[in-house]
Amino acid sequence: ASFLSSKNPVADLVKLNDTDVDYIHVDIMDGKFVPNKTMPYSELKHIYKYTSKRLDVHLMVEDPKKYIPLYAELNTEYITFHVEIDEDIMECLEMIKKYSIKAGLSIKPNTKVSELIPYLPYIDMILVMSVEPGAGGQAFIETSEDKIKEVRSLLNSYNIPAVINVDGGINGDTVKRCKNCDIVTSGSYIVKSDNFQEKISSLR
């Protein structure tokens, strides 16, 4: 579950503790890699004290190395950053692994899947963006279904056990187009509803 569209994240996190959601997806934006910017780490750290769930941290930032040590302190399962950054990707992946956290790479809708190939042996997750990153409530991009299949084929051809996560515009209808993935990340569909568990169950 993602909180980009949440009006009251603390209350929503407490409600999610009573569901069977697998992870809390944490979107971090620096106002440079994407136009929007998230609140400071000091505030986010306070908010995420209220969840008992493991965190799936998505860094939409130009320099992941500044953020990895901070979010490694939390109850974090995955830290994912974008393959499109200009920084040393291997250095960032190694830093995440140093904290015994699973490392992932995220890929924008218009980025070629082949960009991931050099890093496949070192990643635990590929986060396929099914919207342009940086804002909640967007519609699922139709070509994402083919991209998910392409990523699955790539992992199979290289015999890589990484999981595929799909993020953006996920609801009870669009989830049917994500059959080749392992995890879906949904925000507005869950947090804007009256019954979190009902919406989560509809995505399984």
Where are these predicted regions, by residue range?
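Catalytic cores of alpha/beta
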Residues: 9-16, 65-73, 111-123, 168-184
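Hydrophobic faces of well-ordered beta-strands that scaffold small-molecule active sites
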Residues: 1-2, 24-26, 55-59, 77-81, ...
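N-terminal active-site wall of soluble small-molecule enzyme domains
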Residues: 25-95
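Alpha-helix-loop-beta-strand connector modules within alpha/beta enzyme cores
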Residues: 37-57, 95-106, 144-164, 168, ...
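Structural motif
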Residues: 19, 50, 74, 99, ...
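Active-site beta-loop-alpha junctions enriched in small/polar residues
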Residues: 2-6, 29-31, 60-64, 84, ...
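Glycine/Thr-rich beta-alpha phosphate-binding loop at enzyme active sites
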Residues: 30-38, 42, 109, 119-163, ...
